[in-house]
């Protein structure tokens, strides 16, 4: 069943890539709500299902009624939970656990990404940067590993969307990266909240150095710095301070030796991290070689 829904989501994502029809987009949004309800009904997360259904269908109605370009863009941002419009996310994730939470943070957002790319307006660029700062400030007041991971994932998704705006080719790369990575990680999540103190989850969702999320930030900032400004320097400072919030998690993972938390998959640990690094090196080396070839062509 899970494999079928994964293939179905990939199909919906490809469909949104190749169409700009509002009714088709709305139909995909509706189908994603149905997929989430079908996946959640066996987990007993009825509060999260109800909150998600009400929020998504209300915003879907607004998406059809308010047929204004920029307003539709903000509505889709709110539907996905892009910061700073992520205020409703905790009302859903509070009752989600295990792989279902991973699905909500990754696969559930994928079909919305092509719509955001097509509706993007440059005037909304700084809203994404403001949302990233909101996530960094919010990390200082959160309690619990689960909430920190949700906010970290939300912040990472903002960077992913910004990367897609700067290069459409990155959309395809990141799409396949998330699909392959979640195929490795999702089947191995355990019972309730203990699984969120694993090294595998830490690597993927906390943007550790030399992971894909880390490189995404570096390349986005290299493009954004062309705009120049003190706000971007402030954003870099907040990125550093946010890592201090994760230090408690890192210390706990290093010193705890409890049986119920000692379920890290060491083989997966040594497989996922090299894949992340090698995929980034290969992808961006190809881009660099293409740019060098173009430069040589123009010099000739």
Swiss-Prot record:
Disulfide bonds: none
Compartments (UniProt record): Mitochondrion inner membrane
GO molecular function: NADH dehydrogenase (ubiquinone) activity
Catalytic activity: a ubiquinone + NADH + 5 H(+)(in) = a ubiquinol + NAD(+) + 4 H(+)(out)
Family: Belongs to the complex I subunit 2 family.
Annotated EC: 7.1.1.2
Keywords: Electron transport, Membrane, Mitochondrion, Mitochondrion inner membrane, NAD, Respiratory chain, Translocase, Transmembrane, Transmembrane helix, Transport, Ubiquinone
Name under which the protein is recorded: NADH-ubiquinone oxidoreductase chain 2
Role according to the record: Core subunit of the mitochondrial membrane respiratory chain NADH dehydrogenase (Complex I) that is believed to belong to the minimal assembly required for catalysis. Complex I functions in the transfer of electrons from NADH to the respiratory chain. The immediate electron acceptor for the enzyme is believed to be ubiquinone.
Transmembrane segments: 4-24, 29-49, 58-78, 87-107, 122-142, 165-185, 201-221, 231-251, 267-287
Topology term for the membrane: Multi-pass membrane protein
UniProt main location, coarse: mitochondrion
GO CC term, one of those recorded: mitochondrial inner membrane
Enzyme class: translocase
Gene: ND2
